[in-house]
């Protein structure tokens, strides 16, 4: 048995999944916009990164990592809090998990995020240990798929910024849709445990 139960008795699963997926997409779009602003402000060019002669790029990199995790975490929390009132630390956990995870490499982006998010909801979901596993697979997969779409669209769209935006939407869609399905499963399982 778990310490807390998901909140609402009336639960529209398809709507909740759509909200979760949309929130994840919006979070990625906001993070993308903030990251583009950071790139502009710090004149973050590939040449400057490879030469390593600008210490402020470290600050820019940290800000970029924090902003992406923060924007996705906040957008998801706005949906999650409706059903999981104990999720108050979701935003800082997602921010930290994403930043630390991706700092170690793209493959760890989902693991870091998933572990941090699981820590927040571990007492709510009896089968919540699936969350980091799914996140470890889906976050990098979504990111790579979005990056591939973005790369394929740069020439046809004639804009790296627009192609990147489409890629980010694909990233958010994949991550949001699959983690949303897992979240629904966890919520259903928890309701079944609570009803027993």
Where do the language-model regions lie?
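Juxtamembrane/disordered regions of integral membrane proteins
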Residues: 2-196
């Amino acid at each position: 048995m778990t310490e807390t139960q998901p909140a609402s008795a009336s639960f529209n699963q398809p709507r909740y999944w759509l909200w979760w997926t949309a929130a994840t997409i919006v979070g990625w779009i906001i993070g993308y916009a903030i990251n583009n602003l950071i790139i502009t402000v710090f004149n973050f060019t590939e040449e400057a990164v490879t030469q390593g002669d600008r210490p402020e790029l470290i600050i820019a990199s940290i800000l970029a990592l924090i902003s992406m995790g923060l924007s996705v975490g906040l957008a998801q929390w706005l949906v999650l809090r409706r059903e999981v009132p104990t999720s108050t630390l979701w935003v800082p956990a997602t921010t930290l998990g994403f930043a630390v995870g991706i700092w170690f490499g793209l493959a760890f982006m989902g693991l870091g995020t998933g572990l941090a998010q699981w820590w927040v909801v571990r007492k709510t979901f009896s089968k919540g240990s699936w969350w980091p596993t799914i996140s470890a697979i889906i976050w990098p997969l979504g990111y790579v798929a979005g990056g591939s779409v973005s790369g394929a669209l740069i020439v046809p769209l004639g804009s790296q910024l627009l192609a990147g935006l489409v890629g980010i939407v694909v990233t958010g869609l994949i991550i949001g849709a699959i983690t949303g399905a897992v979240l629904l499963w966890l919520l259903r399982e928890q309701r079944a445990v609570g009803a027993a």
